[in-house]
Amino acid sequence: MAEKTKAFELRTKNKTQLLEHLKELRTELSSLRVAQVKSPNPSKLAKIGTVRKAIARVLTVFNQTQKNHLRAVYSKKSSSKIPTDLRYKKTRAIRRRLTNKQSKVVTLRVSKTATNFPQRVFAVKA
């Protein structure tokens, strides 16, 4: 079971299959740890690393698929209703920045001045 599992192969599996595979890998890891204590065989030690990485790979695929499904569920809702871990990341400064609509808002006085005194266009004599 310790052969290297590929992430693209794991993505084809459904949730129950992934959890079964994870359970198998964890039991194998525990048996390898017991074998490590009983007899320090170098081949078993190397196998522990591959099994641990396989477990990490399965968990990564599982969490990514789960997050994608949740994003699809929340896609129709407004941004304030989406859980924070599903929102876009960007940077803190960008998230706090004014939106385009907010930055284009002009006071009444400025808008009246702009309409009453438009910018002049000059023709250049050649």
Swiss-Prot record:
PROSITE patterns: RIBOSOMAL_L29. GO terms for biological process: maturation of LSU-rRNA from tricistronic rRNA transcript (SSU-rRNA, 5.8S rRNA, LSU-rRNA); translation. One of its GO terms (molecular function) is mRNA binding. PANTHER family: 60S RIBOSOMAL PROTEIN L35, LARGE RIBOSOMAL SUBUNIT PROTEIN UL29-RELATED. InterPro entries: Ribosomal_uL29, Ribosomal_uL29_CS, Ribosomal_uL29_euk, Ribosomal_uL29_sf. One of its GO terms (cellular component) is cytosolic large ribosomal subunit. Belongs to the universal ribosomal protein uL29 family. Keywords: Ribonucleoprotein, Ribosomal protein. This is Large ribosomal subunit protein uL29. Pfam families: Ribosomal_L29.
